[in-house]
UniProtKB/Swiss-Prot annotation:
Subunit structure: Component of an alternative cap-binding complex (CBC) composed of NCBP1/CBP80 and NCBP3.
Protein name: Nuclear cap-binding protein subunit 3
Basic and acidic residues composition bias: residue spans: 174-188, 451-468, 507-517, 550-562, 583-596
Source organism: Xenopus laevis
Family from the record: Belongs to the NCBP3 family.
Length: 618
């Protein structure tokens, strides 16, 4: 070997102690093509194998990483290297990639919030993850953290390799780029000249690499003495000041016509929230997280894609996790394997009616999910503790997600409910209880409720209450008739008619021997004539039996009396016949009334007929 190049160590991707995963944006999936599959990190320390949180994605270098192992930029390492070259008679090749530069590590730690294992690279537009890994192929990094389309963080597994890459792949941030380029060309020409001078000797002797030339030992000793006299290069004060300021250093080489600028990354170099949705690279070349779709992707489309991906993966794998996570084998899932799966066409517009019908059907099978969610949280914590040594935590998260989706309860399906739905259900129950209470109170107020103290303690009291109720009903029924008569008021001529009718039956009991006795006239003594005195006849027992007549009848009787005084005896007999006919008519009316008095519903009609009959008689 012409020079001692440090120690190369090959580290497998994903091997060793990997940091725990970070939370990524909703709907994002790792991709194998383009920008390589990400690995998450959650460490907040400056140790070589841990990454500061703030970036959501880590794109791992699957080709293998490079670890220096020792600090070759320290003064002690450079002196050891020179002594080894002197011992084995090696001549060191001078190149830009392997400069003996002493870098004070303690001085670099003075930079605020510095991450010595990470370099911030900007100007990576139109570059993919593989292009950046190819740029740092001499110092292969561990992974890349994309910040936006034009900048990213390149992370190594140790601080020494990152500082070597910064010093050897970038130049001083000054205007003397041309001078730096000329110096680089001069060094490369001198190294070529030295190789040409050494080629005849090596071809003639056919010595193997690593063997010592014994023909010219004096020449080798002179060369090593000259080399040892040359001290190792040190950074100039201006370059040290620029590194302390953490200024951007331009790269020596260009990639796809782009000049890269780099510096040590800080904890403030984080990915902004929603940077993936603003990425012009994804819009132009396609988003590998969503099947290589180009253009602007809506949030609803991303959610549907994510749900379709989970369903397709469940159907494809056909492995469902049981109730006990520890007994069943863990589900090994790699997101990169889903990229090559043929995508199903996703409809942008779905019928809302079908969704509403499905929701209505599922509402009948809703189960309260609060207790089961707490049980799942306990299982998740226990699974993370048990499977920390066997599987990655991102796989466990995905396993639990698959378990929640693919293993419903045997009787009823579980459904997640929002907090607003729970509040609404509580309000409904409160309203229902209030309505039932108010309805019960209203019914009781209408019907009336007896207290326990009012209930009789003996059967005799109950019988007495029944008797009182029946007596009150009878009184009310009897008072009903009188109430009707009171409302109708006193009928005209009714009292007199009743009096005459009550007196008239007494006349029947008398022995009737002749017409006069049948008409109600008293018998005359033998000494007097039949029509001796009209006044005595009118004032006799007939008027006493008939009672007092009304005023109109009195007037009529007075007129008839006057006529009787002036008229002959024939007129008196005609008057008696008229009075007899009137008495018969009234007797018939009384009989009819006595028959109809037993019908209470016809009392009004009877009163009307009697009143009309009295009017006609008058």
């Amino acid at each position: 070997m012409a020079a001692v190049r440090g120690l190369r160590v090959s580290v497998k991707a994903g091997g060793g102690a990997e940091p725990e995963p970070m939370e990524v944006e909703e709907g994002e999936v790792e991709a194998a093509a383009g920008r390589t599959s990400p690995v998450e990190a959650t460490a907040d320390q400056t140790s070589p194998r841990e990454v500061v949180p703030g970036s959501d994605r880590r794109y791992e270098n699957r080709a293998g990483t490079f670890i220096t192992g020792i600090d070759v930029t320290s003064k002690e390492a450079i002196e050891k290297k020179e002594q080894r070259a002197k011992r084995f008679h090696f001549r060191a090749e001078v190149s830009d990639d392997q400069r003996n530069v002493v870098l004070d590590r303690e001085m670099m730690r003075k930079v605020p919030k510095v991450r010595l294992e990470t370099l911030y690279i900007c100007g990576v537009d139109e570059m993919s993850t593989q292009d950046i890994f190819a740029f740092f192929k001499q110092y292969p990094p561990g992974y890349i953290e994309w910040l936006d389309d034009s900048s990213c963080n390149v992370v190594w597994l140790d601080e020494v390799t990152a500082s070597r890459a910064l010093l050897n792949l970038s130049s001083k941030p000054t205007n003397e780029k041309g001078q730096r380029k000329k110096d680089g060309e001069h060094r490369s020409a001198r190294s070529k000249k030295d190789r040409l001078d050494d080629s005849p000797q090596s071809s003639g002797d056919e010595t193997e690499e690593g063997e010592v030339e014994e023909d010219n030992p004096n020449d080798a000793e002179v060369e090593t003495e000259n080399k040892s006299e040359n001290p190792p290069e040190t950074l100039s004060q201006a370059e040290q000041a620029s590194i302390l300021k953490n200024d951007l250093r331009p790269s020596i080489k260009t990639v796809k016509g782009n000049r890269l600028y780099m510096r040590f990354a800080t904890k403030d170099d984080k990915k902004e929230h929603g940077a993936a949705s603003k990425s012009q690279y994804y819009m132009k070349y396609g988003n590998p997280n969503y099947g290589g779709m180009k253009g602007i992707l809506s949030n609803s489309w991303k959610k549907r894609y994510h749900s379709r991906r989970i369903q397709r993966d469940v159907i494809k794998k056909r492995t469902f996790i049981g109730d006990d996570v520890g007994l069943t084998p863990t589900y090994k899932h790699h997101h990169s394997g889903l990229v090559n799966v043929p995508e199903e066409p996703i409809e942008e517009e779905e019928e809302e009616e079908e969704e509403e019908e499905e929701d209505m059907d599922e509402d009948d099978r809703v189960v309260e999910y609060r207790d089961e969610l707490q049980a799942f949280k306990r299982e998740r914590e226990g699974a993370r503790r048990c499977a920390a040594s066997n599987s990655d935590s991102d796989e466990m998260d995905y396993d639990l997600e698959l378990k929640m989706i693919s293993t419903p309860s045997p009787k009823k399906s579980m459904k997640m409910t929002m907090y607003a739905d729970e509040v609404e259900s509580q309000l409904k129950t409160i309203r229902h209880s209030m309505r039932s209470d108010s309805a019960g109170n209203s019914v009781k107020s209408r019907i009336g409720s007896k207290s326990h103290s009012e209930k009789p303690a003996d059967v005799r009291l109950i019988l007495e209450e029944k008797r009182q109720s029946t007596a009150s009903r009878q009184q009310s029924s009897s008072s009903g008739k009188s109430d009707v008569r009171q409302r109708l008021g006193k009928r005209a001529h009714s009292p007199e008619i009743r009096k005459t009718l009550s007196i008239a039956p007494t006349s029947r009991r008398e022995p009737l021997s002749d017409v006069h006795s049948r008409l109600g006239l008293p018998k005359q003594p033998e000494g007097k004539g039949l029509y001796s005195d009209s006044k005595e006849k009118k004032t006799g027992s007939l008027w006493n039996r008939l009672g007092t007549a009304p005023k109109e009848k009195d007037r009529a009787s007075e007129k008839s009396g006057e006529k009787s005084q002036a008229a002959p005896e024939e007129e008196d007999s005609a008057l008696q016949q008229a009075w007899g006919a009137l008495i018969k008519e009234k007797e018939q009316i009384r009989q009819k009334k006595s028959r109809l008095d037993n019908l209470p519903s016809l009392q009004i009609e009877i009163s009307r007929e009697s009143s009309s009959g009295s009017d006609t008689d008058s």
